[in-house]
Amino acid sequence: MGAYARASGVCARGCLDSAGPWTMSRALRPPLPPLCFFLLLLAAAGARAGGYETCPTVQPNMLNVHLLPHTHDDVGWLKTVDQYFYGIKNDIQHAGVQYILDSVISALLADPTRRFIYVEIAFFSRWWHQQTNATQEVVRDLVRQGRLEFANGGWVMNDEAATHYGAIVDQMTLGLRFLEDTFGNDGRPRVAWHIDPFGHSREQASLFAQMGFDGFFFGRLDYQDKWVRMQKLEMEQVWRASTSLKPPTADLFTGVLPNGYNPPRNLCWDVLCVDQPLVEDPRSPEYNAKELVDYFLNVATAQGRYYRTNHTVMTMGSDFQYENANMWFKNLDKLIRLVNAQQAKGSSVHVLYSTPACYLWELNKANLTWSVKHDDFFPYADGPHQFWTGYFSSRPALKRYERLSYNFLQVCNQLEALVGLAANVGPYGSGDSAPLNEAMAVLQHHDAVSGTSRQHVANDYARQLAAGWGPCEVLLSNALARLRGFKDHFTFCQQLNISICPLSQTAARFQVIVYNPLGRKVNWMVRLPVSEGVFVVKDPNGRTVPSDVVIFPSSDSQAHPPELLFSASLPALGFSTYSVAQVPRWKPQARAPQPIPRRSWSPALTIENEHIRATFDPDTGLLMEIMNMNQQLLLPVRQTFFWYNASIGDNESDQASGAYIFRPNQQKPLPVSRWAQIHLVKTPLVQEVHQNFSAWCSQVVRLYPGQRHLELEWSVGPIPVGDTWGKEVISRFDTPLETKGRFYTDSNGREILERRRDYRPTWKLNQTEPVAGNYYPVNTRIYITDGNMQLTVLTDRSQGGSSLRDGSLELMVHRRLLKDDGRGVSEPLMENGSGAWVRGRHLVLLDTAQAAAAGHRLLAEQEVLAPQVVLAPGGGAAYNLGAPPRTQFSGLRRDLPPSVHLLTLASWGPEMVLLRLEHQFAVGEDSGRNLSAPVTLNLRDLFSTFTITRLQETTLVANQLREAASRLKWTTNTGPTPHQTPYQLDPANITLEPMEIRTFLASVQWKEVDG
């Protein structure tokens, strides 16, 4: 997403072998020399030393201005990924990434002093595979010389608010692996580079540090925060990004770029800009060299005052710039020469081509003591009424599809690793996890899962995910056939959330295979739409298990099919097969819902199991009380739906609510309804209260046996806007808890941060938007507590949330807006015009503050990696001859401890797998069960289908061996950091500290799958 650059029409292409000369797209453009011409002119390539040895020379007693030529190439925004790459639909935005890379390489070859940085590997890898071998060698030399430098190196520049940490790690691993495979250590980025995301999370910084980055630069931060930092000279500092990991494990040097990511005003020399080129001929009436040089010196000097060293940076580029790189570099060449010539006249400014890594290297050599930051950079505002907190909730359906796809990708990865080649080549065809892996990586882009692209681009993101599911379904089918010992016609019912599954709805008998991707046993309630009748369900051992067929009320005009319910017991990292058969009877035994009339004299309505009771107000139909019966905790809780009237920019500010910006017209939201029509469903397997608030808003409050949480399944949409009011819909929980203005949210699904209403930890806040300015990203959970009781709400996707008054907690579930917010999309968030109907769920936990983490940590793990249901008609042919059919399987020989999460199990190549194990509790989170204590594992015989023959530990993204990895060291004002303990690796003795993730590459030998 761009700050300034908007486009109109450029096209260029270079020679490939004998493909011909460069073609001109504009009559006045000078011809760019073809790449093949430079093959004879390359300087002899010397081996690039690991790190910073190729950086340019600076002047120690001058202000060194590091020019950073770069382009920011959104992986989808106003155009789709393919449209951006190929330069299609330039009437929407002029941008063609393939031409940018062609042009940059030619321009770099024209002058050995020039440098350039590139970021988005989704684009670069595509361009790379279209090049000749000769061009690839040219590029390798440029990388080796440090003149083409990769920053960040992920598949995309991911969003930091709406992304789950597991998906962040995956997309960074994908991009960095491409660089490692293509360029070796020469291509490894030293610097993380997030110049456009709209706020920055603490967990993102922690992950970057664990990935091995030396530093981190970003462009956007709150306008009040930036002003304070400039005055205090804290535009650069060390970010201590974890309260559990021992420093400097999660410490990351962090710098705020002075101009966002754009050039200084009047110094943009791209075809997309209108600034005047530098004219140095004094005979020309357009001569401006002296004026521009003086202007540059003033800008550099003024900018340097806000930074602590004699070094400062200028980002020379912006959105999709450098399609005519010669235009940029020709003017920069002149600028460098003319500015440095002023040194003979007493100037103390030295300007040079540089890179983020080389700038960071100079800061490190300055050997200063730096301040430390402990919180994060949310929420972000670029003006008094312009809080970028709307995108936390924009496009909720796409956000959910992304989270479901992450779940499915992990299942796909795990079975590929457990089965080996038989998963890729089998009776169902060629299975492949790569398409979904790449699609998921694209979805992490800061205009994708954020919901801030145009509608046709959001549709294309969904298309990419759907295309990735297909090859993974083939892979799963091959793997299940191999592990079960026979093949069948497997069916993946992707619309179970709306009770659609043709096989279960038409077949008199079928099989249900349920795969559990967690490293511990799970009991899971299976719900399948069926025809009316009675069904018998049998477990893997042929024993009948309790089941129910329930008819549910419908909140719309469409009939809701009956649903079959049964509880499946699932082994760790494995599956169980259940057989379902319809039993003919004269009278169906389906249980129908009971409508509950609204009578003031009616007794309170309750649903309960052995752990929890929920009570509903008979007058309003609303939830009014939750009781934890194990702890004897009783909390009045009133939950219902409200909506904020979205600003259209017609009051004290012209800022409207839009895809990015949340700005309600008033602080007090309006109720969707003050009461709900309710129906009650009670069976031995489920108890539900169905609440209908309006034609477009309903909810089911649900309890299963043994469940320690309350499930609230909400359905919202299409949001009506016929009254010309845009609406931003929230689910709000009101309690009497005395929370003292504090509430707590997760950071990308991992560590928890305290939030305080109308407060920022590092500056005195002038709060100008009391609602939007208190919203924070909620990736998996939000909670409030009075120190004794804690109410926690878990989400099934990323949402915005807050506590706007003591004891209250709210989450934004959907938004539909009539105005654009002026941040570049130029399209209101209408969701296909008619609006989207969205279903989701919140999981509610009530516990003591001391015991709450044990509940929400394990439940959040299960919500993100839920079991995968696969159906088959049964009666398939034997496949793995010599092995008896198998109805149950576990990929582990023993369950992982509850505090350990199997974050990644994926194929890494022939006879090698990638393994990540994570301690999912923070220091001091759970004293009762000691779940925050270090845990030691034996990996030697942990897996059942393969033996680990060799184990190597790596950094988080598997591009450096841990024993060889080192990062730049920084001195902080908090004193020295502890010395790192000597590194040792014993596969039989792997210890995980709280919040630690350990990553391994394991050489494996697969075993014959038998019974």
Swiss-Prot record:
Q: Which GO terms describe its biological process?
A: learning or memory; mannose metabolic process; oligosaccharide catabolic process; protein deglycosylation; protein modification process
Effect of changing residue 379 to L: reported as: In MANSA; reduced enzyme activity
Q: What is the effect of changing residue 74 to E?
A: In MANSA; results in less than 20% of wild-type enzyme activity
Instruction: State the signal peptide span.
Output: 1-49
The effect annotated for residue 202 to P is: In MANSA; reduced enzyme activity
- Relay the cofactor remark from the entry: Binds 1 zinc ion per subunit.
Instruction: Note the effect listed for residue 445 to Y.
Output: In MANSA; results in less than 20% of wild-type enzyme activity
Keyword tRNA processing belongs to the record: no
Cystine pairs: 55-358, 268-273, 412-472, 493-501
What happens on changing residue 197 to R? In MANSA; results in less than 20% of wild-type enzyme activity
Swapping residue 200 to N leads to an effect described as: In MANSA; reduced enzyme activity
Entry keywords, A to Z: Disease variant, Disulfide bond, Glycoprotein, Glycosidase, Hydrolase, Lysosome, Metal-binding, Signal, Zinc, Zymogen
Q: Name one GO cellular component term.
A: lysosomal lumen
State the compartments where it is located: Lysosome
**Sugar-bearing residue positions:** 133, 310, 367, 497, 645, 651, 692, 766, 832, 930, 989
Cofactors (names): Zn(2+)
Reactions performed catalytically: Hydrolysis of terminal, non-reducing alpha-D-mannose residues in alpha-D-mannosides
Q: What's noted about post-translational modification?
A: First processed into 3 peptides of 70 kDa, 42 kDa (D) and 13/15 kDa (E). The 70 kDa peptide is further processed into three peptides (A, B and C). The A, B and C peptides are disulfide-linked.
Binding of Zn(2+) occurs at 72, 74, 196, 446
Outcome (variant: residue 745 to R): In MANSA; results in less than 20% of wild-type enzyme activity
| PANTHER family on file | ALPHA-MANNOSIDASE, LYSOSOMAL ALPHA-MANNOSIDASE
Q: What does this protein do?
A: Necessary for the catabolism of N-linked carbohydrates released during glycoprotein turnover. Cleaves all known types of alpha-mannosidic linkages.
Provide the protein name: Lysosomal alpha-mannosidase
Write down the species: Homo sapiens
Gene for this chain: MAN2B1
